[in-house]
């Protein structure tokens, strides 16, 4: 993948970049592997907003992805690399030897015509899926299961990868894209390689309208709201936030304050990710 740049014919075009989609080989999805998806607008069944800044966007059909990679020992040929509007990575259409078709996340280095397979004794090459116990230390992986047979849950976004760091007893240690080191059962499956669309994080949208195409609504500052809407709201003219510490709309500290509260899975985190400049506690 490469990024395409435009001439500055307008303020929006100046600095705008888009993917050149050179790796895409098929424009229309496999109809039997798609299903409709309804927009929620960020609302739950009661109509209350549970996730802000969601709404609108282009209509999409959901591509059914094979997260489990459970057809062990059955070779599959890569028939196409496709765009998926529901995720940042590209997807690959696999034609299995028994006639079945499935979508998987496309890793870097997987091309049309390649043969992929899953199982405990398969080769260590991009796109093949194996139990972690069969993967050598230091291997780059993605689409990692949290529980055996549950399907890939971690490391699924464009350009991301984890690295197998150690094996000890029933568990293996994996370094996540965030830098966190996490323990996972060795019977869990993972796919070899780094995910495609590596330069996705460097794409510049250029204008607000592109965010709206993607279904992202504007993020309004709390300071610009009324007191009824946000703790920072109100005041005459450009007044300050009036708090000793910036807070979220619900009163939680918002500058790097830890909000994770899941003691059940704390034991699986070997080392936390290092805080970046934007999430350093203040």
From Swiss-Prot:
Location of the region described as Disordered in the Swiss-Prot/TrEMBL record: 24-55, 209-282
Gene Ontology MF terms in the entry: rRNA binding; structural constituent of ribosome; transferase activity
Basic residues bias (residue ranges): 34-55, 209-219
Keyword Iron part of the UniProt annotation: no
SUPFAM superfamilies registered for this protein in UniProt: Nucleic acid-binding proteins, Translation proteins SH3-like domain
Biased segments, Basic and acidic residues type: 24-33
Similarity comment: Belongs to the universal ribosomal protein uL2 family.
Protein name from the UniProt record: Large ribosomal subunit protein uL2
């Amino acid at each position: 993948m490469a990024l395409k740049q435009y001439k500055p014919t307008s303020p929006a075009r100046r600095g705008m970049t888009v993917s050149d989609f050179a790796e895409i080989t098929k424009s229309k999805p496999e109809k039997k592997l798609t299903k409709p998806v309804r927009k929620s607008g960020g609302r739950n069944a009661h109509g209350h907003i549970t996730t802000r800044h969601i709404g609108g966007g282009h209509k999409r059909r959901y591509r059914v992805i094979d997260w489990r990679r459970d057809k062990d020992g059955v070779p599959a040929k890569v028939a196409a690399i496709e765009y998926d509007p529901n995720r940042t990575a590209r997807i690959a259409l696999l034609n299995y030897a028994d006639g079945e078709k499935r979508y998987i996340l496309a890793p870097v280095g997987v091309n049309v015509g390649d043969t992929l397979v899953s199982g405990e004794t398969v080769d260590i090459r991009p796109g093949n899926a194996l139990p972690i116990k069969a993967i050598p230390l230091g291997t780059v992986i993605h689409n990692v299961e949290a529980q055996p047979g549950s399907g890939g849950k971690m490391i699924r976004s464009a350009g991301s990868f984890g690295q197998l760091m150690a094996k000890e007893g029933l568990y293996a240690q994996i370094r996540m894209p965030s830098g966190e080191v996490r323990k996972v059962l060795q019977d869990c499956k993972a796919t070899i390689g780094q995910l495609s669309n590596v330069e996705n994080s460097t794409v510049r949208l250029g204008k607000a309208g592109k965010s709206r195409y993607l279904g992202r609504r504007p993020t309004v500052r709390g300071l610009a709201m009324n007191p009824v809407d946000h703790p920072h709201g109100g005041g005459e003219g450009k007044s300050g936030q009036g708090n000793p510490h910036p807070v979220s709309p619900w009163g939680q500290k918002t500058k790097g304050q830890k909000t994770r509260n899941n003691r059940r899975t704390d034991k699986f985190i070997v080392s936390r990710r290092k805080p970046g400049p934007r999430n350093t506690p203040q």
